[in-house]
Amino acid sequence: MEMDKRIKSLAMTAFFGELNTLDIMALIMSIFKRHPNNTIFSVDKDGQFMIDFEYDNYKASQYLDLTLTPISGDECKTHASSIAEQLACADIIKEDISEYIKTTPRLKRFIKKYRNRSDTRISRDTEKLKIALAKGIDYEYIKDAC
């Protein structure tokens, strides 16, 4: 399965800065009934720990335009508490995905927009995003415009 353009467009416009990789995993599970093939322990450019989820030919971080670097086994010790916390969150999400979506307002809003926004509107938002990024306009401005 390919990366979903509708999720990517909404994540980068209306929901920019609101989602993380756990949210993307939850959305994919809810919308497509797909579980990740692999879990990757990573850090972002600031050294903050984050779990990334690998699917057939894409990762959850790609929906958010995040560049994550996988950590080595030795580095796992440094991030042990974050690993435990995020794995526990992932397990809670997987246990009852529909309840998790219902109790998380931003994901509930995302699902509603995903299901109710027309392909034309999402395509238009994606075009605005491409044009704005080419001109060097900030994501926050784009989010407000969409």
Swiss-Prot record:
- Keyword match Hydrolase: no
Localization recorded for this chain is: Host membrane; Host cytoplasm
Report keywords, A-Z. Answer: Host cytoplasm, Host membrane, Late protein, Membrane, Transmembrane, Transmembrane helix
InterPro entries the UniProt entry points to: Poxvirus_H7
Q: Which residues cross the membrane?
A: 10-32
Record's GO cellular component terms = host cell cytoplasm; host cell membrane; membrane
**Which factors induce or repress this protein, as stated in its UniProt record?**
Expressed in the late phase of the viral replicative cycle.
Predominant location? host cell
Q: Which Pfam families match?
A: Pox_H7
Membrane topology, record value? Single-pass membrane protein
Family per similarity comment: Belongs to the orthopoxvirus OPG112 family.
This chain's function reads: Contributes to the formation of crescents and immature virions (IV). Interacts with phosphatidylinositol-3-phosphate (PI3P) and phosphatidylinositol-4-phosphate (PI4P) lipids in order to form virion membranes. Mechanistically, mediates proper formation of OPG125-hexamers, and hence the honey comb lattice and spherical immature virus.
Q: What is this protein called?
A: Late protein OPG112
Record gene name: OPG112
